[in-house]
Every structure is written in structure tokens, then in C-alpha cells.
Regions:
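Conserved small/polar residues in nucleotide/adenosyl-binding loops
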Residues: 134-138
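Short, well-structured hydrophobic secondary-structure segments
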Residues: 72-89
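A short secondary-structure junction signal
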Residues: 89-93, 133
Length: 138
């Protein structure tokens, strides 16, 4: 795939990450104004590098023309919480939002991986409005 094609594919993901970082940082500010404490301590986001996308697609046997529909973590938002209970509060907030739709959830806190890894993963569908409307998974 040419570099220009990659830019066209990844631009909506960049936009989604930036929009979601703004939205979640606003939630942090709202909580802090209401009671001085936010269940979200930090908001981070990223779009996978082209080489990481290619590597993951090859490992999973995904054709390059299907990466947008079959690779669910091209973009990601990481919400860091200070306390475990806060994670479930934040998961509830995400479920209640009308601007994103939960596609799947994996609770690696209750169901810890053998390696000891603990986290809570939520894959959401988020509508990005560009000149041509695009739906992406975050």
C-alpha cells in the first residue's frame, strides 16, 4: 500500500483519538468541578504505526484490504484510573454515552490472565464526521 493510501486510512483514526481525548478530558474536568475527584486520572491515546498494523495483520492472517474492518485496535484510548473501583465507574460511563456504542468488553481484572495482566478493555464504535462519514472501532 502506498503512503498516501495509509494517510487516507489513518486520518479518521487520528481524528477519533483527538476527539475522544477531548471528551474524556472534559469528563475529568466536570468531575473535578463537581466534587474534586475524577475516576479518570489520565487520558492517553494513540494510532498504531503503519509497521505495527502490517505486523499485526500478518500475524492474524488479515488481508491488507480488510484491515479497517477486521483489525479492531488501529486506534486506542487508554483511561488510567487510580483505584480498581473507578474502572467499573468509567466502564459504566462509557456504556451510557450516546456518541459511542460498545461492541465488546473484556474484564481482565475479575478474570486475570495467566501472566497476571490486569486491565479492562472496551471496544466501541465511534462515528467520525469527516467530509465522508466514517465509523471506526476504538
Amino acid at each position: 500500500m502506498e503512503l498516501q493510501m495509509w494517510k487516507e486510512i489513518l486520518t479518521p483514526y487520528d481524528l477519533a483519538v483527538e476527539e475522544l481525548k477531548v471528551k474524556f478530558n472534559h469528563i475529568v474536568k466536570e468531575y473535578q468541578q463537581m466534587n474534586g475527584y475524577s475516576p479518570i486520572e489520565q487520558v492517553l491515546g494513540r494510532v498504531k504505526s503503519i509497521s505495527s498494523i502490517i505486523d499485526k495483520a500478518q500475524k492474524k492472517g488479515i488481508d491488507m484490504d480488510k484491515i479497517e474492518t477486521q483489525l479492531e485496535d488501529i486506534a486506542g484510548i487508554r483511561l488510567i484510573c487510580q483505584f480498581t473501583e473507578d474502572i467499573y465507574t468509567v466502564a459504566g460511563l462509557i456504556r451510557e454515552r450516546s456518541d459511542m456504542q460498545v461492541k465488546s468488553e473484556k474484564d481482565y481484572i475479575t478474570h486475570r490472565k495467566k501472566s497476571g495482566y490486569r486491565s479492562y478493555h472496551i471496544i466501541v464504535l465511534y462515528k467520525v464526521e469527516t467530509l465522508s462519514l466514517i465509523h471506526i472501532s476504538e
